[in-house]
Amino acid sequence: MNASWIVANMEWVLIVCGALTATMLFPMIAPRLAFKQMFGEVAEGPLGELLTRNWGQMIFATGLLLIYAAYHEEARLPILVFASFTKLTFAALVLSNGGRYGRKLAMPIAVGDLSMVGLFVWYLLAVS
C-alpha cells in the first residue's frame, strides 16, 4: 500500500482506533475486574483503585481525542504524537516484564497499541 491510502482513510483509522482506545473506560467503572482480566492481578487498596480509575479515564480521554482528530485535521499532529507516546509507553512496560503478562489480556492490548502507532507514524510520514 502506498502513502495515499493512509491519507485517504485516516478519518476511519482514527475513528476505529479511538473507539477501541475508548473501551478502556472499563477500568474506571470496574477497576478490580478490569485489572484482573488484563493483568491477572489487582492493584489493592483505595490507592490502587484510585489510580486504576484515573488510568482508565485518561486512556478513555485519549480515545476521544483520536475520534476528535478524525474530524479536525489541524489537531492531528499533537493528538497523534500524544497517543503514540502513551501507547508506546504501555507496550514497552508490558513487554519489558518478560513473560509475566504474555498470556494475559495486556499482551494483545500492547500489540494492538503498537499496530495503532504504526498506522499513526505511517500517516505522519505521508503528510510530512
Task: Give the positions of each predicted feature.
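Core segments of alpha-helical transmembrane spans in multipass integral membrane proteins
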Residues: 19-28, 47-70, 84-88
